[in-house]
Amino acid sequence: MLSFGGSLLSHSDIASRNKFSIDYSQFKAFFPGNWKFSNSKDKKPVRSPTLDEPVGDVDIDIFDVSKFYPLKRLSSIPEKIRANYHEELQTTSYDLVRNPFTHGLFCVVFYHQNKSYLKMGVTDNFNAFEEDSRVYQYGVNHKLSCKNLLLAINYSPKTYTKIFDFLRNGRAPLQVLVHHCMLYNFYPEDFQDALWCAVQAHVMNQVRLGRATLLHARACYQKIGDIRMYLIDPHDLYFSPNSLKWLIICSKQFQALVHLEVKMDTLKIFRRRSKYFNLARSCVSGFELSWLIMMTSIGSNASAVPVHAYLASKRILYPSIIPEEIFFMRKFDSSLFKDIKNIHELLGFLGRLFMDLQDCEKFHHDYTEYHCYRIGKPLYQNYEEEALRKKSQGVKDADFIKPLVTNTRTAEKYKAFFEYKRNIVLKKQS
């Protein structure tokens, strides 16, 4: 993929040299035969596109992604640093892996004139787009969407407050977490902090399952990189043998080529003045170091990556491969990017928030039952302790009786189970 000649310049770098026009001879010199980039020839001002409207004046084509390197084989790691990990990281032709993509969603995220664009389409060829592929611009009507989101928060503060508490305490299911992470750029700072807390809990759960390392958790606690990238399996990340400015996210039914903001380079994070210096020193493998380099290089383009489509292709989120929306998970989210003249136009989005709250409450209830099962503590014992605590504080017992009655079957089931396990242990000891 991307066999460049000469220095590696992106289309945004070249376009920035001339504010009014693009010199196509420069593209021919630096991107011979690999890229097809076209702008509208009409001199009239181009109308700003809507969120789900394709852009007709920008296009980009790419081919030859049949083989690439896993991210852990990042070739920019110097020899002195490689020696610290006691492992061979020199990339050879034997390290090239075949593209696992068979069919599904194929997309390219790229910069142009300080804007992020996403070209996407459904195909069964990892080297070409179908004719019905389209290019979309990310971040359309950013100020308007922030305003509408604040309007929704002010209209239903109780719902948002409860969702905020679930996110901050790490008690939100994955579908709710992904839904709000894809709206991250439009939320106020307090809600963004709550989303980071929820993602931190998600990453720590992945660490317990052996799917992530402590470095991923440390980086998440320091809020390094884009929040959406922590939802992607690090083993699905690759890079091109000819360019370190492109990241490849690939699975059997999803492929995304992401244009990085800066070139992936290890030396920049190992400078003592770098804010990533201490974190880079804690890396225990080249795989961790390569991932950290990628997170510090990706920039804002990760916001346009359809993470919900990636999780859907992995059968993690929901079974559909093709998402309903391009940049967002729910179809009602598109109402945030329109000129709202009446609060009734946001009722669909507000209804979706209420459903998110119900999902959080159900997840919290199921988590409580699982936690009691895992630590060997019956569920009914939680209610007894809660009743004693409220009684000592002078709280009436009415709040305790209702959940105890509604969970009688569950309590009896766990009580019988733990008594059975206790009898087995006592027999073995005797």
UniProtKB/Swiss-Prot annotation:
It is found in: Mitochondrion. Signal peptide: none annotated. Has a role in meiosis. Keywords: Meiosis, Mitochondrion. It comes from Schizosaccharomyces pombe (strain 972 / ATCC 24843). Belongs to the UPF0300 family. One of its GO terms (biological process) is meiotic cell cycle. One of its GO terms (cellular component) is mitochondrion. This is Meiotically up-regulated gene 132 protein.
